[in-house]
C-alpha cells in the first residue's frame, strides 16, 4: 500500500498491523486456542479490516495479500505472543486496552488516508476508515463465537469514526496531511480510552 504522504503513513499502517496482530493472538491465548488458531486470529485481526476496505474501493488483490510485509508483521505479532505467552498472560487488561486503542487509531487514520487517495467522497472515506479500524476485531470476535465489540453498547466504532472525521476536517482547514492524521489518530485514541475508563456507552433499547 503506497501513500502520496510518503513512508510515514505506510509505517503507521504496519504499526497498526503489528499491534492488532499481538491483540488478536492475545485473544487466542485467552480463548485457549492452539498455535494454528493463534496465528489465524493474529492474521485476521491484523489484516481483515484493510482487506475489507481494499475490496470496497476496488484495490484488488488487497494490499495485505500483495505485499508480504503485512502478513509477515501480523504473524510476527502472533509469534511474539506465542513465545512470550507467560509474560503476556500477566499483562494487565488496562495495557491491552491501550494497545487496542492505539491499533484502532492507527488503522482508522491509515484507512481514511487510503480512501482519500482513491478519490472517495469524504463521508465515504470516514466509513472506510472506520471499517479499517473495526473490521479485524469484528472477525476476531466472530471466530471466538462472541458478539463483535462494534455491536455492543461501547464507544469503539464511534471513536474510529470521530478520528476519521477529525482527520478530514483538519485537512479541510488547511492542516498538512500528516498533522491532520496525528490529530485524528489522537482523538480516536483518546476517545476510546476515556470511554473505557469512564464507562461511556451508547444508548441501548431495553424491553
PLM feature segments, named:
Residues 122-125, 138:
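Membrane-embedded alpha-helical hairpins and interfacial helices in multi-pass inner-membrane proteins
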Residues 136-146:
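Membrane-helix boundary/interface segments in integral membrane proteins
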Residues 1-122, 145-207:
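Alpha-helical transmembrane segments and their membrane-interface boundaries
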Amino acid at each position: 500500500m503506497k501513500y502520496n504522504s510518503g513512508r510515514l503513513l505506510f509505517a503507521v499502517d504496519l504499526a497498526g498491523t503489528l499491534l492488532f496482530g499481538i491483540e488478536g493472538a492475545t485473544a487466542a491465548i485467552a480463548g485457549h486456542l492452539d498455535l494454528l488458531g493463534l496465528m489465524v486470529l493474529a492474521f485476521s485481526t491484523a489484516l481483515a479490516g484493510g482487506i475489507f476496505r481494499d475490496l470496497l474501493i476496488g484495490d484488488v488483490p488487497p494490499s495485505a495479500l500483495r505485499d508480504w510485509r503485512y502478513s509477515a508483521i501480523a504473524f510476527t505479532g502472533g509469534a511474539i505472543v506465542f513465545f512470550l505467552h507467560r509474560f503476556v498472560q500477566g499483562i494487565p487488561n488496562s495495557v491491552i486496552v491501550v494497545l487496542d486503542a492505539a491499533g484502532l487509531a492507527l488503522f482508522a487514520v491509515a484507512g481514511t488516508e487510503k480512501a482519500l487517495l482513491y478519490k472517495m467522497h469524504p463521508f465515504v472515506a470516514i466509513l472506510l476508515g472506520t471499517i479499517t479500524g473495526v473490521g479485524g476485531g469484528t472477525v476476531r470476535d466472530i471466530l471466538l463465537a462472541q458478539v463483535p465489540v462494534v455491536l455492543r453498547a461501547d464507544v469503539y466504532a464511534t471513536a474510529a469514526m470521530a478520528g476519521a472525521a477529525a482527520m478530514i476536517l483538519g485537512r479541510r482547514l488547511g492542516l498538512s496531511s500528516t498533522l491532520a492524521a496525528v490529530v485524528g489518530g489522537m482523538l480516536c485514541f483518546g476517545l476510546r480510552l476515556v470511554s473505557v475508563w469512564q464507562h461511556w456507552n451508547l444508548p441501548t433499547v431495553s424491553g
